[in-house]
C-alpha cells in the first residue's frame, strides 16, 4: 500500500542563553517602570514563532531557516506600596539555522491552491521542505533596569506584526522611554526540516481491539479499597527536598 507522509531530512537542537533582551512594555507598564524602585520578572511566555525557509545560494541541498520568537514578559514593580504593580511587555529574539533539506526540482500543485488577494500573487508552487520548530517556554535567568540614553537610538528597529500587537491591551512603547527593562532568557528548542515523500508499506488486516470497554457506572468494577491497597506508600514525597547551593538557580539581578 502506498502512503503520502513527511520524512525528516535533518534536525538540530539548541540550548540558547539570550542575554539582555529588551522588553517593550505597554504604555501603562512603561509609566509604572519610570517611577518604580525595583522590578522582578515573574515569567516569560512564548506567544508565536515566525519561520522563514530560503535555499542556500552555494549549496542546493541546504536551506537557511530564520526563526523569530515573540515572548510575553510579566513582571512586578515595587513603587512604594504594599502590593507590587504588574508589568507586561513583549520581547523578541531571532536566530538562524542551516539544515539539509535535500534537492527536488519538481513543482507541486494541489487542488486547494488558490489565487491570493487582489495583489496578483499566487501561492508558491516550489518544492521546498517544511521547517518545524519545537520550543519550550523560556526560563527567566536574570533581569535588570537601565536608563535610556538620551539622543541615542537602537541600532535595529524591531518589527512587530499587528497580530502580535493585538495580543496586548495597550500599545507597546518602542521609543521615547526613560527607563528600559532587560531580561536574560534560557530556551531549549529543536529545529527540523521535513519533506513530502511517498512510501510503500506492507498492508495487514485491520487490527480489532481485544480489550472490552467498561460499561459499569464509574467504569470501574474493581473494589476501590483493593485497588488502593496495591499502591506503594509514597515515602519519597514525605522527605523534604534538600537545597544544593552549588546548583541553585541564580537570583534575578535588578
Whereabouts are the PLM-identified features?
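Viral structural modules
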Residues: 1-254
